[in-house]
Regions:
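Short, hydrophobic, well-ordered secondary-structure elements
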Residues: 1-25
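Long, charged low-complexity segments
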Residues: 24-124
């Protein structure tokens, strides 16, 4: 069975989106931000809850994840995702399977954000 890299990449982004929405909804339950992660991060005020170093890690991780993630990847085939990543030139300099490597990077970036943001979240 073929690995579903597109779904893995999609869920990495959705996990971060969900975390940021949890923060946003406490501040403004009706704010509509779409699926744009940088706007969600800004609206979440997560930076106010973390250290300077954690804030820098979140920014770097979010930029890296956002380059790869799009909300419409949910039902995307691996072939279409390969084309998407090639168009963004994210296949350059990668040894081996660039699709697998980009998914690994996306998951690593999402994990970094979640490891920082989840413990700081305080439900209202």
């Amino acid at each position: 069975e073929a690995a579903q890299y597109s779904f893995a990449l999609y869920t990495a982004g959705v996990a971060v989106e969900s975390l940021l929405r949890a923060y946003v909804i406490q501040l403004d339950p009706i704010l509509e931000t779409g699926h744009y992660l940088p706007l969600l991060l800004q609206a979440s005020k997560l930076h106010q809850a973390v250290t300077q170093r954690e804030s820098e890690l979140i920014d770097i991780s979010l930029i890296t994840l956002t380059r790869r993630w799009k909300n419409d990847l949910r039902y995307t085939s691996n072939q279409r995702l390969r084309r998407h990543l090639k168009k963004l030139k994210l296949d350059r300099g990668v040894r081996g399977d660039f699709l697998k490597e980009n998914c690994r990077i996306a998951i690593e970036m999402a994990t970094t954000i979640l490891k920082i943001g989840v413990p700081k979240w305080k439900p209202s």
